C-alpha cells in the first residue's frame, strides 16, 4: 500500500473485530492512525467451504476529509441470497452494500458512521452490531401471546371439523 495514497481491502474472520491480545493491539493502531475507513460484516457461508462469518476491512492512507476521524460500519449479514450449498451476494446485493457506503450516513439496522472517540470508549472493539442502531421489535405480553395462541387453536379446530365433514359427505371417511 502506498504510504500517502494507498488503499486496500482485507477479508478476515469476524473474530478480529473483537478478540483481545495482538488483534486488539492491531485494532488500536488502525484506529489511532485513522487508516480504517470502513468495515463490512458478511453472512456466514459467503466464501465457499468456509462457514465462518467474514468481514472486509477497508484501509485508506488518504481518507476524504469528510471521513477523517470516523469509521463506516456496515452490517451486510442480512444482505445476501441463500442458495442450496452456500449464501451468495448477487450484483444487486453488492450494489446495495456499496450504496450504503457511498451514502455515508447511519441507517437503522444496516450502517453506522462511528466517531473514533466512540470506538476508544468501547475499548477499540469493532464489533459492528454494537454500533449500529437496531429496530426494536414490539414487545408482546405473555397474556397476549396466550390469547392469540388459543384463538388460532380454535381456528384450527374449526377448519379440522369442516374438513372432516367434507370428507364424510364425500364418502372418503366414515363418521
Where are these regions (language model features)?
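A conserved structural/catalytic subdomain of Rossmann-like adenosyl-cofactor enzymes
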Residues: 1-175
